[in-house]
Amino acid sequence: MDSVIESEEGLKVDSPNRADAETSNSKIHEEDEKELKTESDLKEEKKKTEKNKQEEDEKTKTVPFHKLFAFADSFDIILMILGTIGAVGNGLGFPIMTILFGDVIDVFGQNQNSSDVSDKIAKVALKFVYLGLGTLVAALLQVSGWMISGERQAGRIRSLYLQTILRQDIAFFDVETNTGEVVGRMSGDTVLIQDAMGEKVGKAIQLVSTFIGGFVIAFTEGWLLTLVMVSSIPLLVMSGAALAIVISKMASRGQTSYAKAAVVVEQTVGSIRTVASFTGEKQAISNYNKHLVSAYRAGVFEGASTGLGLGTLNIVIFCTYALAVWYGGKMILEKGYTGGQVLIIIFAVLTGSMSLGQASPCLSAFAAGQAAAYKMFEAIKRKPEIDASDTTGKVLDDIRGDIELNNVNFSYPARPEEQIFRGFSLSISSGSTVALVGQSGSGKSTVVSLIERFYDPQSGEVRIDGINLKEFQLKWIRSKIGLVSQEPVLFTSSIKENIAYGKENATVEEIRKATELANASKFIDKLPQGLDTMVGEHGTQLSGGQKQRIAVARAILKDPRILLLDEATSALDAESERIVQEALDRIMVNRTTVVVAHRLSTVRNADMIAVIHQGKIVEKGSHSELLRDPEGAYSQLIRLQEDTKQTEDSTDEQKLSMESMKRSSLRKSSLSRSLSKRSSSFSMFGFPAGIDTNNEAIPEKDIKVSTPIKEKKVSFFRVAALNKPEIPMLILGSIAAVLNGVILPIFGILISSVIKAFFKPPEQLKSDTRFWAIIFMLLGVASMVVFPAQTIFFSIAGCKLVQRIRSMCFEKVVRMEVGWFDETENSSGAIGARLSADAATVRGLVGDALAQTVQNLASVTAGLVIAFVASWQLAFIVLAMLPLIGLNGYIYMKFMVGFSADAKRMYEEASQVANDAVGSIRTVASFCAEEKVMKMYKKKCEGPMRTGIRQGIVSGIGFGVSFFVLFSSYAASFYAGARLVDDGKTTFDSVFRVFFALTMAAVAISQSSSLSPDSSKASNAAASIFAVIDRESKIDPSDESGRVLDNVKGDIELRHISFKYPSRPDVQIFQDLCLSIRAGKTIALVGESGSGKSTVIALLQRFYDPDSGQITLDGVEIKTLQLKWLRQQTGLVSQEPVLFNETIRANIAYGKGGDATETEIVSAAELSNAHGFISGLQQGYDTMVGERGVQLSGGQKQRVAIARAIVKDPKVLLLDEATSALDAESERVVQDALDRVMVNRTTVVVAHRLSTIKNADVIAVVKNGVIVEKGKHETLINIKDGVYASLVQLHLSAST
């Protein structure tokens, strides 16, 4: 093996003069690089500081409030105007009531000795009823108007955000965002924005109009007393403002730390097979919990500051009262005010200023909404440099398809310091086929990305038909270019819809025709739902070959002038490859075709082959021309491929390898890849999700069955039990809440005593008012202590609960068996939404709701006791009214519960659409599918939108009726009181004592019913979370029970295995499969695509359990072994390795649960031939690999993945197509690494390249779910008409 050339160093040749040339060149290069490096280092540092600064800013930046409504249409504006009118009217209800109230007091106070009090009161009572009717209408308008317009605008913001995200250039996704963040913003942040522009605005307007109304009335009744009371207003305003500022700062900080946790969820769930295989559950959990801690801190701090602010507000209010009572007494004596007038002024100022106090939840909602809107609106405003929605630019009748890259300099935006092309030029004449070959990372795929205009070169130009690509209308030119890439990205919808992405409004006929051309119609017709079969998230329900043919059909439907094939067949087995290649050959006719490949067989027939090396074209010509120069780069590539194989399969091998090479580099650039990678994350095995059958995906009807859509009701105690550790906090908080609750009724007693004092003789009036004033001040001090205590204790408990629920739920998710993630409702998008939004809502069920409930109970009890002591007859009469008020609150709660449930689930579906599209942004861009995605998204949002509107109307009715009932019961109580006074059953001060004690209790109740939307949302959220927490994982990696063998030999046996994937119970994968693998030997599984090869690997790792039969390791059934230990004995290397967005070091250490020593990491990297290229990177082992590893080439990723598998020193090695995606040189290096690590380990290889399989100790041929042949290569090849022999034939014919 002397000839192994380290792939990263380039093709070095032994001829002396070449070597000299290289050394001198390399010297020059080194100097260039030095200069570049110092510049780039400076830039890096600058970039870092800028980035930190940006992050700091982001924490606190907000949008001006009026900007939240930037996206309203005319109907919204009408709704908001109506809502505003309603809110103003509703807000004036209370100030007007104070006038009626003063009348009542004067009637009672001035007629203490006459007997016709009830007639005079009857007149006033009637006015109360009219006022009730007015507020009913106003409240209805207010709530419905604002709720509906808020729902509509939030929907529009979601769509606009998605739309702008979809039109961004690819660089934006490489550098600035990732799928987790986008979905998080769409599901979490829009809720906050909607909150800030919906009913909360109505409420704020209502409160402001109460404030203004109150003061206008007070000044008209008596300006002097009002002025004295107003002197305290600045204090109120200042404490209120300080409060709002602190809250908004904290809210945005909490969001930032939670967004980081969301990324952990997306990465883990998206790559669950890798996590399971490397028993990385603990690591993911601790990573997640780290981010939760900072979110918890921010939450508690927010609670504490709110409490202090509100406490301050309260003491100011009570001192104002004290002042008013004392000074009001003076006014009666000196200025001849009546008692009623003084009370109108006190009440009017009081309701006015209290209304400001109640505005704090609105303020905090506005602040949170403004902070959330900042990032979203920034994104919506961002103008991409390459804008898919830009309609300017040239549109020709058609293009010929001449492509020219002229003197192009390019580096990826995510890695500006690495120059990919320096002065690269290439021209391709129309109708010809050009193949690009070269090592992994040489820039082949970059050419494809530039032709698609995913990126623009930094200098130089890309021209089509002689016109600079930038001059064309982007959408139009992309519609002329068809891309088929190595890992095709399919969307979570039906096969038909996936193909239809190729062409707007394609007919079923056209789609059928495209499937026939792509050789896909056969397998599609076999599926129970045919074209309507769902493909699963990222197409996981189909095998690799099937997905690729659908992708080809999609490209055919588009009928492009220019066809870009990026490793289109490298990931397929011989049979599928031949079929797909045939389909491609048919459609390549008369089109300009650019093929990136590393299997030379694919490129042989190209009109021109260009060999790219380190971003330059080193040779070009046809296959035969290039072979004439035996020292040329192309000849070397071929020789490399042939070195290790016998000619018979060399070509095919070559073919692959080159292809794959190409692929990899493409990948580098490509998020698409990264995207598509995602799919493979799901499908860690060569075939997606290990589901490689030729059969169909989950039939729709099954999905319905599998999701119990009706989530069980969760009892309040169940959630409360989770808060157990905080019981001391909750008890202290509850004590504070009880005290807080009693303050209002006591306040009622004070008022009635003051009323009585106002009608006493002058001397007594003077001393009484002074006494009560002091009592008011004491009450204020009490409130100042009790209020902050309540909020602090409850927010500690609440934030701990949210943290605990998120953590528990995530822990549970990570422990689910892999099959659970195959279900659509458990996709990474849906789980992310559950963890972020639902966990936060549950808090409303315990902490906050509990505080409110305890406080209300205390108010009610205190109120009742006071009332019954004062006058039991009147107390009964007033009490009879209270159930009406209570009933109204209850009806309102019920309505709210019915609605919020379905809306939540429907938005989850919509967020899945977004997740898919952003995850597959390259595919969306190349098929100009932005509008299509938007249509799908909007369609999914229609249902929740209608629900939201219904909710608005019903809430409005409930809200309005409650006011009407309230005012009518006032009228009734006063009239009843007047009759009792007439009859001498009670005195006038007792009437007021009963009245105030009970109304203050009622105020407490109505405040709690305002919580209802939150509590109903919370119980639905709790149900969705407990559905996860309660589900027992069928195969639980955290289960410590089970045997652990002291010494593993590595004998594996599968006996009579039958198996179906849980997500597709009607497709039998294995029927009675038997296979035994001896310790230390290598067994290769071969068979057609979809025969079940990768399924064997999934079963050996216990991702799934067989339906019947057993699998044993060293004679022990694996179900009886401890799962975590079992998985630590197996090392998996799959075709598309999933790397996490961490450093290379962290990715390798992941194999050992993150605690590998530096020496272990380096030696694993050396064994896997990765140490060389890693040391060559600027940051070495500390290089970040990017989301899904996009910053490394295919060969590099694969070697890191092998190092990761080796670091755990497994007894059993599972290689699932480990080298199929690599070019010749990388493959050689990787294969060499694999040969080293396979020694003394039991190895199971799934492969379709013969060279990889030939030397296996046993080859097993899988067909129709059983093993049909097994033996050594030499034996099997000689079976006449044997399955293996015919597969080999296929291979050879495919490769010639």
Curated annotation (Swiss-Prot):
Subcellular location, principal: membrane
Membrane-crossing segments per the record: 77-97, 128-148, 205-225, 227-247, 307-327, 336-356, 731-751, 774-794, 865-885, 952-972, 986-1006
Record membrane topology: Multi-pass membrane protein
Record-level GO cellular component terms: cytosol; plant-type vacuole; plasma membrane
Glycan attachment points: N113, N409, N505, N519, N590, N826, N1141, N1240
Keyword annotations: ATP-binding, Glycoprotein, Membrane, Nucleotide-binding, Phosphoprotein, Repeat, Transmembrane, Transmembrane helix, Transport
Xref: SUPFAM superfamilies: ABC transporter transmembrane region, P-loop containing nucleoside triphosphate hydrolases
Binding site for ATP 2: G1087, E1088, S1089, G1090, S1091, G1092, K1093, S1094
UniProt domain ABC transmembrane type-1: residue ranges: 80-368, 730-1017
Similarity section: Belongs to the ABC transporter superfamily. ABCB family. Multidrug resistance exporter (TC 3.A.1.201) subfamily.
Protein name, entry field: ABC transporter B family member 21
Gene assigned in the entry: ABCB21
